[in-house]
Each structure stands twice: as structure tokens, then as C-alpha cells.
Regions:
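Residues that define the transmembrane beta-barrel architecture of outer-membrane proteins
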Residues: 32, 67-72, 107-112, 160-164, ...
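Transmembrane beta-barrel strands of outer-membrane/channel proteins
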Residues: 38-46, 89-93, 130-132, 180-184, ...
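Transmembrane beta-strand segments of Gram-negative outer membrane beta-barrel proteins
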Residues: 27-56, 128, 212, 355
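Residues on the lipid-exposed face of transmembrane beta-strands in outer-membrane beta-barrel proteins
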Residues: 38, 42, 67, 71, ...
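Outer-membrane beta-barrel "beta-signal"
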Residues: 322-324, 328, 351-370
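Outer-membrane beta-barrel channels and translocator barrels
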Residues: 31, 81-83, 121-123, 135, ...
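Detector for outer-membrane/organellar transmembrane beta-barrel domains
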Residues: 175-178, 195-196, 202-310, 314
Length: 370
């Protein structure tokens, strides 16, 4: 009887301890990393044409000021990163926030990121995220330090920087990442009034090694009320090739179509070609050369009051970067745009060419608190 009692007691103790052990060993119970992030980018820009207003062009939404010092973007936020869940909340201000969030009401203008995500499987290669998050469209970030050029390319300025919705991210291997998203519209936090149709997008990233990557992203949706709904279809394709530790090349091609009217079979098409070459002279000094062409002559995503139509222009820029440490950047850029139309303000008239210079000072910090 004594042996039976001992065996029974040991069995009960083992069973009772299982939940506690399972809880202790569960990846959900692991302590997450908590990171405090901050960024500040100040700039001065001067337009040779000397426009009569302090904004340069209606199709720019970053660094779009003339002959003044200003803050393009400043944010502060917290992020949580754990094996099974993650989240980020960042609040921002600056001319970028003012221009890109012009359609958003009240305090929504101050949301840079606000999203949460959870892992959907044991391998943690299938994730669901929801909230306000960076757009999958484009090869540039609002944070200039993350980009090869100081100012934003025409392709990125006229496609979404952020989306609001939910997305599923699947990473079957180190080479491939697949994403699907449903969102409130083309760079929207709050949906357009009386629009009952959500928008959709996809992304495919192929990274065969550290030197090369290819990204193909799409968007399907509308940004208009139901009674005037015009469908939009957009494709964003680019590749990054880091040939050596010093020299890299980026090439991109965007094309989109929007219905000319509700239920119309006619579409207004726009496209953008972009190329950027970057050379790092040392760990602290680098330079980039950009060439681009933007054609939206029917005004699908741009509108020029003078033409009562859209933008057609080509452009070239060169920038020099000095980074004394990885968290600080001093940058200078010269940029030239030329259009077949006289669209660029010069004093009280319009010309075909636009030349402007931009300098910036940026600081970006990430501090782990846990």
C-alpha cells in the first residue's frame, strides 16, 4: 500500500506541475524587448526660381519649403518585440506630417505608426498585423537616413507612405517574403466618407543573398465615395543591387491606372522610372546620383492648376552625405527638374525648369529599455 501511495502521489505532483511548467516554457511568456525610438530631421531648402510662396511644388510632400529652416519630420515612440507578438506606437510632427496627413482630422495627423501584431504559427513565420503601418509601396522611407537620397523621389512622393488596415506576412524561407493587406484606402487613416469599399494590396520580396533583392508590390482600390467610384490599379517594382561594399544601384518602375469616370472602360495611366546609384568613399562619406521620369499627363495622382491636368517631368539629383557616427547625418543635395510644359513657378510666371538645393541635419536613436 505504501508503494501505491508513493506512486500515486508522484503521478499527481507531475500532473499538477505540468500547467505551471508549460506556462514557464511557453514562448508567449518570454519577456519582450522594449525600445525607445526618436528621430529628428531639420532642413533648409532654396529654390532658384524663387516662387512667391514658401512651398515649392504641389506634388512634393517632404522638404517642400523655400528659403526657410524647418523640421521635415520628428518622431518619438515605443516598440515591443517578442517572439510571439510585437507592437509600435510613434507620434510625429513636422512639414512631412502636415503635408501628408492633410486629409486626416485632429490628432490623427500625429500618428506616425500605431500597430500591433501576433504570430499565427509555431515557426513564427506567419504574422498578422493591424493598425497604422508603413506602406509596402515604394523604395523610400519618410526617414531620410534610411534612403540613399536626401529628398524623396517622384515615385515615392506620389504613392502612399502609410496605410491603415490589416495585413498577413508569410516568410517561408530566408529568400522569400509574401504579404497581403486590406486597408482603408490610398494613404488614409480615416476612410473617405460614403466609401464602402476597402482597398487591397500584395507584396513579394525576393532576397537571394545580402547583395541583391527584388520587390514587387500592388494596390487595388478607390479613394472616392460610392456614387463617383473610380477604381485604381497600381504596380510598384524595384530592385536593389549592392555590387560591392562601396557601390550600389537601385532601379524602379511604377505603373498605375485609374478609371476616368465611374464604370468607365477608359483609364488614365501614369508611370514612373527611377534609378539611383550610390558610392561610399569611406564609412563616413558617400554620394548618390538619381535620375527619374514621371508621366501623369491625365492627372490620376497629381493635379496642376495651371494645366488643369497632371505632371510630366524628368529629374536629376546629386547628394553628398557625411555621417560622423551611424546615428547622425549631414547631407547636401542639388536637384534639377525639367518638364515639357511651363509648370514651375518663377516669380510671377512659369518656366520649364526647376533647380533647388537642400541641406539637412538628422539624428536617429534607438535605445533598448528591456
Amino acid at each position: 500500500m505504501k508503494w501505491i501511495w508513493l506512486i500515486t502521489s508522484a503521478f499527481l505532483l507531475t500532473v499538477l506541475k505540468q500547467p505551471a511548467l508549460a506556462q514557464e516554457e511557453s514562448p508567449w511568456a518570454e519577456t519582450p524587448e522594449l525600445t525607445l525610438s526618436g528621430y529628428l530631421g531639420v532642413f533648409y531648402s532654396y529654390d532658384i526660381n524663387q516662387p512667391t510662396t514658401n512651398t515649392k511644388q504641389p506634388f512634393f510632400y517632404s522638404y517642400n519649403r523655400h528659403n526657410e529652416f524647418n523640421v521635415n519630420l520628428a518622431y518619438i515612440g515605443l516598440s515591443i518585440d517578442q517572439a510571439k507578438y510585437r507592437a509600435s506606437l510613434k507620434l510625429h510632427t513636422g512639414t512631412y506630417a502636415n503635408d501628408n496627413y492633410a486629409a486626416e482630422p485632429g490628432v490623427l495627423k500625429n500618428i506616425y505608426e500605431a500597430y500591433a501584431g501576433i504570430s499565427l504559427n509555431k515557426r513564427n513565420n506567419l504574422w498578422l498585423e493591424a493598425g497604422v503601418f508603413p506602406s509596402h509601396l515604394g523604395f523610400e522611407s519618410p526617414v531620410a537616413m534610411d534612403n540613399w537620397t536626401l529628398t524623396r523621389s517622384l515615385a515615392n512622393e506620389n504613392s502612399p507612405y502609410f496605410l491603415t488596415g490589416a495585413k498577413v506576412i508569410y516568410t517561408p524561407s530566408d529568400v522569400v517574403e509574401i504579404m497581403g493587406v486590406v486597408c482603408n484606402g490610398w494613404q488614409r487613416i480615416q476612410m473617405v466618407e460614403r466609401n464602402s469599399l476597402l482597398s487591397f494590396g500584395t507584396q513579394l520580396i525576393i532576397t537571394p543573398n545580402e547583395k541583391y533583392s527584388m520587390n514587387w508590390s500592388t494596390f487595388v482600390g478607390t479613394d472616392e465615395p460610392d456614387y463617383s467610384r473610380r477604381m485604381m490599379y497600381f504596380s510598384n517594382l524595384f530592385a536593389v543591387m549592392q555590387f560591392t561594399s562601396q557601390f550600389g544601384l537601385l532601379a524602379g518602375f511604377d505603373i498605375g491606372m485609374e478609371q476616368s469616370a465611374k464604370e468607365s472602360e477608359k483609364y488614365n495611366t501614369w508611370y514612373v522610372v527611377s534609378a539611383i546609384a550610390r558610392y561610399a568613399f569611406t564609412e563616413k562619406w558617400a554620394a548618390s546620383l538619381r535620375g527619374e521620369y514621371f508621366d501623369d499627363q491625365y492627372g490620376a495622382v497629381t493635379y496642376l492648376e495651371k494645366l488643369d491636368n497632371g505632371l510630366r517631368t524628368s529629374g536629376v539629383s546629386i547628394n553628398v552625405d557625411y555621417m560622423p557616427v551611424p546615428v547622425v547625418a549631414c547631407r547636401l543635395e542639388a536637384r534639377w527638374l525639367r518638364s515639357p510644359d511651363e509648370i514651375y513657378p518663377k516669380n510671377d510666371s512659369f518656366v520649364k525648369d526647376n533647380v533647388f538645393f537642400t541641406i539637412s541635419l538628422e539624428v536617429k536613436l534607438d535605445k533598448k529599455l528591456l
